[in-house]
């Protein structure tokens, strides 16, 4: 099943929290927490095994959804102690279900990773996961400016924010060119 991290957490407040569907919201928050890798929530979940970590802002939408859950639901702060089975307990780990951590530790990992900066190449980089992206687009360098708190990252060959359309036309000359390169 394909599930989009950014879209999920942008809509979670309106679809689940303000409508009182707290158990569903909790399950989604914790389910995505299990997939954290490189300090990021995947933009494309794809069942957890072929997730794409090509989105700089999905993790921030996830964190906002957690704050909304805490503020809107009764006993919302209890979610911070909820156990999460980590599918990737480290950046280089293969898929596993042997490590369990409370949500608050995973939140901390995401924040510390961003503050320290992260640099990685997407797993399975190439046509198998994106038939239009150039090779350099699979390289990611992301961080947070400690002076401003602004998130930075990406390069002219990838699109890691909400305007993530990758050009696909050789005829038009935009194949492999993001509509909004960073």
Label each region the model flagged.
Residues 1-182:
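Acidic, mature catalytic/reactive cores of soluble proteins
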């Amino acid at each position: 099943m394909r599930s989009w991290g950014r879209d999920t957490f942008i809509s979670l407040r309106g679809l689940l929290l303000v409508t009182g569907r707290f158990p569903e919201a909790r399950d989604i928050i914790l389910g995505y927490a299990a997939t954290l890798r490189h300090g990021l929530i995947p933009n494309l979940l794809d069942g957890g095994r072929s997730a794409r970590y090509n989105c700089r802002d999905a993790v921030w939408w996830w964190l906002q959804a957690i704050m909304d859950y805490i503020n809107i639901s009764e006993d919302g702060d209890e979610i911070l102690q909820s156990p999460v089975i980590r599918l990737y307990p480290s950046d280089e780990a293969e898929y596993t279900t042997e490590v369990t951590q409370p949500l608050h530790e995973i939140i901390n990992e995401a924040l510390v990773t961003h503050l320290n900066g992260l640099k990685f190449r997407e797993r399975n980089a190439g046509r198998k996961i994106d038939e239009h992206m150039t090779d350099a687009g699979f390289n990611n360098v992301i961080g947070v400016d400690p002076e401003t708190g602004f998130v930075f990252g990406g390069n002219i060959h990838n699109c890691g924010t909400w305007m993530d359309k990758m050009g696909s036309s050789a005829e038009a000359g935009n194949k492999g060119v993001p509509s909004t390169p960073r």
